[in-house]
Swiss-Prot record:
Major glycoprotein, comprises over 80% of the envelope proteins present in virus particle. InterPro entries: Capsid_hemagglutn, Hemagglutn_HA1_a/b_dom_sf, Hemagglutn_influenz_A, Hemagglutn_influenz_A/B. Disulfide bonds join C29-C481, C67-C292, C79-C91, C112-C154, C296-C320, C488-C492. Homotrimer of disulfide-linked HA1-HA2. It is found in: Virion membrane; Host apical cell membrane. It comes from Influenza A virus (strain A/Equine/Santiago/1/1985 H3N8). This is Hemagglutinin. Glycans are attached at N23, N37, N53, N78, N180, N300, N498. The gene is HA. Palmitoylated. In natural infection, inactive HA is matured into HA1 and HA2 outside the cell by one or more trypsin-like, arginine-specific endoprotease secreted by the bronchial epithelial cells. One identified protease that may be involved in this process is secreted in lungs by club cells. One of its GO terms (biological process) is fusion of virus membrane with host plasma membrane. It is a single-pass type I membrane protein. Residues 551-565 are cytoplasmic. Keywords: Clathrin- and caveolin-independent endocytosis of virus by host, Clathrin-mediated endocytosis of virus by host, Disulfide bond, Fusion of virus membrane with host endosomal membrane, Fusion of virus membrane with host membrane, Glycoprotein, Hemagglutinin, Host cell membrane, Host membrane, Host-virus interaction, Lipoprotein, Membrane, Palmitate, Signal, Transmembrane, Transmembrane helix, Viral attachment to host cell, Viral envelope protein, Viral penetration into host cytoplasm, Virion, Virus endocytosis by host, Virus entry into host cell.
């Protein structure tokens, strides 16, 4: 009975031991912010690591409309850019228009004489980058021919008409003399001339319009020469026409001369388009144009450019994020997340950063929890928090600066005869996208690794700073906590936090308390041993009592035990 009482008292004494319960000591733990549910990011060393906060770097959706600010966006409606340039009857509204971005719709249609442009993509790109359809008529002299040819396939209102920027020349009477016309460029800018050649559907149509059985058109400058011969023959009818017109273009530099020579089939220029160098462009899109502000436009609509990457569309205009294949890339903007444990062992003591993070910290990423004679408390450390935030805040802006394109990514178009070039261009573009996608993932992983290492380092700096302040007045308990061997009220804790703690003031008291406490203090390891020993002794005593009861009962005859062999 005495043994049992002693064991009970010993067990109660062990459980009642708490290193921080005395009025002459205190416990100070250092910790960091944590959240219940963090965000997974990728680093160089880990595919998935949880952090307290992260920012998405990939813009994956558009706003569904094209913003008309800060760029001048011109809605082509039913006209392509080339149709507007040639002077289609239903595109007259676009004469002399200016734009930063010309939007071509899928609803475009043709209502004039059927034509083709052998180098359509190049002409479209040149006109688009010029950003204007500013046209100047010139006094070409076409002697001995009939000008202003018209076609029933090209109606302006109810009347037969033709492309307003071109002059269709046919015979005059029974003659079509050889034409030789020159036009110098005395200006200080490039001139773009549009001209063409008519391909009749039959020999009869050829002689009916031009007298000669076969015409010829030669257009030359000091730098170039083009000679085109008509291809006479029937073709599938378009708007009642089996003939075709091929459109060509010539750029005349300042000081150069345009020379036109023809003996038939000439579709002559009426003047020139003034060439300008700029970053205007053209884009095919059916997204509506609205009043809003966005510096990046895609065929899907405008997108914000506050992220370094996007996977909305390869084709962009303006200051846009870099296109990559990934749907998501997250940049760590917080520290490694270690959710707080709700139960921290048998004694319920406060814990430091080695064990877990602290949820609910609102005044900093790093901080202190303490337990002293005045109770318990928590406070953030603003200096270490600000040091980490300052280094992290610039990461997103630096990534955006490295990746945002300050130019437009134009659409690539090639004719069928340039199929091999188109395949090569596609291969190059796909390779660039693959390379950028890899670089983006690597860049983000490196930045995330740096962020986590940085925040861990700031925690360690704060711990070392606190340890150097306390010196021999405290003992490192492990887990990010210190046992302070002197009375340390809230003012004392505050001096440790703000770096004004003077360990000399408390040195004698701490040394005295350390020697007194160590004489009777049982470490947690010894407590565990005592608990196990007491448990074993209790089990042994129970067995002894049970065996003694059985032997007593057998002697009294209350229990009979038969052993058979």
């Amino acid at each position: 009975m005495k043994t049992t009482i002693i064991l009970i008292l010993l067990t109660h004494w062990v459980y009642s031991q708490n290193p921080t319960s005395g009025n002459n000591t205190a416990t100070l733990c250092l910790g960091h912010h944590a959240v219940a549910n963090g965000t997974l990011v990728k680093t160089i060393t880990d595919d998935q690591i949880e952090v307290t906060n992260a920012t998405e770097l990939v813009q994956s959706i558009s706003i569904g409309k094209i913003c008309n600010n800060p760029y001048r966006v011109l809605d082509g409606r039913n006209c392509t850019l080339i149709d507007a340039m040639l002077g289609y009857p239903h595109c007259d509204v676009f004469q002399y228009e200016n734009w930063d971005l010309f939007i071509e719709r899928s609803s475009t249609f043709s209502n004039c004489y059927p034509y083709d442009i052998p180098d359509y993509a190049s002409l479209r790109s040149i006109v688009a980058s010029s950003g204007t359809l500013e046209f100047t008529a010139e006094g070409f002299t076409w002697t001995g021919v009939t000008q202003n040819g018209r076609s029933g396939a090209c109606k302006r209102g109810s009347a037969d008409s033709f492309f307003s920027r071109l002059n269709w020349l046919t015979k005059s009477g029974n003659s079509y003399p050889t034409l030789n016309v020159t036009m110098p460029n005395n200006n200080n800018f490039d001139k773009l001339y549009i001209w063409g050649i008519h391909h009749p559907s039959s020999n009869n149509e050829q002689t009916k319009l031009y007298i000669q059985e076969s015409g010829r058109v030669t257009v030359s400058t000091k730098r170039s020469q083009q000679t085109i011969i008509p291809n006479i023959g029937s073709r599938p009818g378009i708007r009642g026409q089996s003939g075709r017109i091929s459109i060509y273009w010539t750029i005349v530099k300042p000081g150069d001369i345009l020379m036109v020579n023809s003996n038939g089939n000439l579709v002559a220029p009426r003047g020139y388009f003034k060439m300008r160098t700029g970053k205007s462009s053209v884009m095919r899109s059916d997204a509506p144009i609205d009043t809003c502000v966005s510096e990046c436009i895609t065929p899907n609509g405008s997108i914000p450019n506050d992220k370094p990457f996007q996977n909305v569309n390869k084709v962009t205009y303006g200051k846009c994020p870099k296109y990559i294949k990934q749907n998501t890339l997250k940049l760590a903007t917080g520290m490694r997340n270690v959710p707080e444990k709700q139960i921290r062992g048998i004694f319920g003591a406060i814990a430091g950063f080695i064990e877990n993070g602290w949820e609910g910290m609102v005044d900093g990423w790093y901080g202190f929890r303490y337990q002293n004679s005045e109770g318990t408390g928590q406070a953030g450390d603003l200096k270490s928090t600000q040091a980490a935030i300052d280094q992290i805040n610039g990461k997103l802006n630096r990534v955006i600066e490295r990746t945002n394109e300050k130019f437009h990514q134009i659409e690539k178009e090639f004719s069928e005869v340039e199929g091999r070039i188109q395949d090569l261009e596609k291969y190059v573009e796909d390779t660039k996208i693959d390379l950028w996608s890899y670089n983006a993932e690597l860049l983000v992983a490196l930045e995330n690794q740096h962020t986590i290492d940085l925040t861990d380092a700031e925690m360690n700096k704060l711990f070392e700073k606190t340890r150097r302040q306390l010196r021999e007045n405290a003992e490192d308990m492990g887990g990010g906590c210190f046992k302070i061997y002197h009375k340390c009220d809230n003012a004392c804790i505050g001096s440790i936090r703000n770096g004004t703690y003077d360990h000399y003031i408390y040195r004698d008291e701490a040394l005295n308390n350390r020697f007194q406490i160590r004489g009777v203090e049982l470490k947690s390891g010894y407590k565990d041993w005592i608990l196990w020993i007491s448990f074993a002794i209790s089990c042994f005593l129970i067995c002894v009592v049970l065996l003694g009861f059985i032997m007593w009962a057998c002697q009294k005859g209350n229990i009979r035990c038969n052993i058979c062999i």
